[in-house]
């Protein structure tokens, strides 16, 4: 979607469900890529890990900054939220040059309360993305 001659917004896949409104799965769940002439910024939104990250990286990567979900995780939610190692792998799949963790320290759901989201991060490789 061209937002202006200086900004294009790509609406891309994410893996989650939609729970807004009276019925589930009646609205779209997505991630976004913001492209300017100078850089590409990816926002994962809530998403479980999946092959969509590699597909996005293959089509649009590398991205300059990936703002990645990292805070509502629990093994029971693995299809809709990522564990820290999956977040790092997704950033690697996107070929992100830098990563900004989202949701860090924001959880109030059952098993995630009090978990330190940043300590679970592992960067995929020495030349992999930096954490902002």
Curated annotation (Swiss-Prot):
Domain of life: Bacteria
Signal peptide: none
Gene3D superfamilies: Ribonuclease Z/Hydroxyacylglutathione hydrolase-like
CC annotations in GO: cell outer membrane; cytoplasm
Keyword Membrane: yes
UniProt-annotated location(s): Cell outer membrane
Annotated keywords: Cell outer membrane, Membrane
Family from the record: To M.tuberculosis Rv0906.
Name recorded for this polypeptide: Outer membrane protein RomA
Lineage: Bacteria, Pseudomonadati, Pseudomonadota, Gammaproteobacteria, Enterobacterales
